[in-house]
């Protein structure tokens, strides 16, 4: 296996040369995905912005995330790098020496859940636990929750985005116990479905969770949670579990405590997603601190990702797609800037959704959005 030194952030990693050449990178003999660098950039920034000095990279591979935290977050005292692949751990250990952080790292050859459950106990838990599997994280959630300290941070990634975005709804119901939506705000629904799954798993252990950062790409959805131990905290989390309803006929979206069959506006059959998280996905102060970390570390893409989330929770848990709305009206696509300007002129706030390629979030109801877009379309035709 030919190895190369690959620099990511301020950290030198030992990775197979083929991992930098093949797309997708091979999973054997060890796995490293260079395309996930943004995921790890954001992770470093959020970790640096929060309190705590112990970190568990529970699916470490060649050690990219754990080594970056050990190297780039100065207050970190102990980082556990866990993997079942002996060859991957050997590379992680060699890279730890290369970066001068081997003394603060511990290496464990173990299956993820077994290791995480072994860390249950007041003095054995971690301030940060990261779960980043290939596919669904559901099988690791209970162990990860038990291994995270009270007021610690649990970060969870899901890479089965086609499942979470509604391409395979039966698989989503089996894995996540929830129904997704395959529509223009499917990625936000995917984020909320993952958050809801984590909240329900935590509640079964009398633990609450509070999302502080959430982001997504075409390949993954990822949520950082503050862990809050206690039955009352669990009950508070469950109060943010609900359902989203979307009407394919008229485009109306609503949130409910339970499923609804018919659209409230047109009365036709609606589509439901859930149970999922309908509460806030971010905390502004955490985002601001993480953004400052990204700026100070010269990580422009991470800074852009974090900045795009500011203000997202001022709006309902869905978005409107401009192309979809214009198509529904039978008009040419109206410029995004004109829609924002028109909404603000009549007293509404709006922003680009950070979860989809296109789309806007607004506090205006959908009929008013349709009215504005229609008027702009007529004006453009003259």
Regions found by a protein language model. Give the residues of each.
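SAM-dependent transferase fold signal centered on methyltransferase-like domains
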Residues: 1-382
């Amino acid at each position: 296996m030919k190895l190369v030194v690959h620099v990511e952030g301020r950290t030198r990693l030992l990775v197979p040369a083929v991992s930098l050449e093949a797309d997708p990178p091979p999973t054997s003999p060890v796995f490293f995905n260079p395309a996930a660098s943004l995921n790890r950039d954001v992770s470093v920034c959020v970790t640096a912005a929060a309190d705590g000095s112990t970190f568990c990279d529970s699916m470490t591979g060649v050690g990219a995330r754990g080594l970056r935290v050990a190297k780039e977050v100065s207050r970190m005292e102990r980082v556990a790098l866990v993997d079942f692949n002996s060859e991957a751990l050997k590379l992680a250990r060699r890279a730890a020496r290369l970066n001068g952080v081997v003394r603060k790292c511990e290496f464990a050859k173990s299956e993820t859940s077994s290791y995480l459950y072994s860390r249950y106990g007041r003095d054995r838990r971690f301030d940060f636990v990261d779960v980043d599997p290939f596919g669904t994280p559901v099988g690791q959630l209970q162990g990860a929750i038990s291994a995270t300290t009270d007021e610690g941070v649990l970060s969870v990634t899901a890479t089965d985005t086609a499942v979470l975005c509604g391409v395979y709804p039966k698989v989503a119901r089996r894995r996540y116990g929830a129904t997704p939506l395959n529509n223009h705000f499917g990625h936000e629904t995917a984020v909320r479905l993952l958050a809801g799954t984590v909240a329900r798993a935590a509640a079964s252990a009398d633990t609450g969770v509070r999302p502080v950062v959430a982001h997504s790409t075409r390949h993954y959805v990822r949520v950082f949670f503050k862990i809050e131990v206690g039955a009352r905290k669990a009950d508070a989390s469950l109060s943010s579990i609900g359902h989203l309803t979307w009407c394919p006929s008229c485009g109306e979206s609503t949130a409910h405590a339970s499923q609804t069959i018919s659209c409230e506006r047109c009365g036709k059959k609606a589509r439901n997603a859930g149970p999922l998280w309908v509460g806030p996905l971010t905390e502004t102060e955490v985002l601001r601190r993480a953004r400052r970390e990204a700026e100070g570390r010269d990580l422009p893409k991470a800074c852009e990702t974090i900045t795009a989330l500011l203000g997202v929770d001022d709006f309902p848990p869905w978005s409107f797609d401009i192309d979809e709305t214009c198509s529904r009206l039978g008009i040419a696509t109206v410029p995004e800037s004109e829609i924002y300007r028109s909404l603000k002129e009549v007293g509404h706030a709006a922003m680009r959704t950070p979860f989809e390629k296109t789309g806007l979030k607004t506090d205006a109801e959908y009929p008013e959005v349709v009215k504005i877009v229609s008027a702009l379309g007529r004006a453009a035709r003259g």
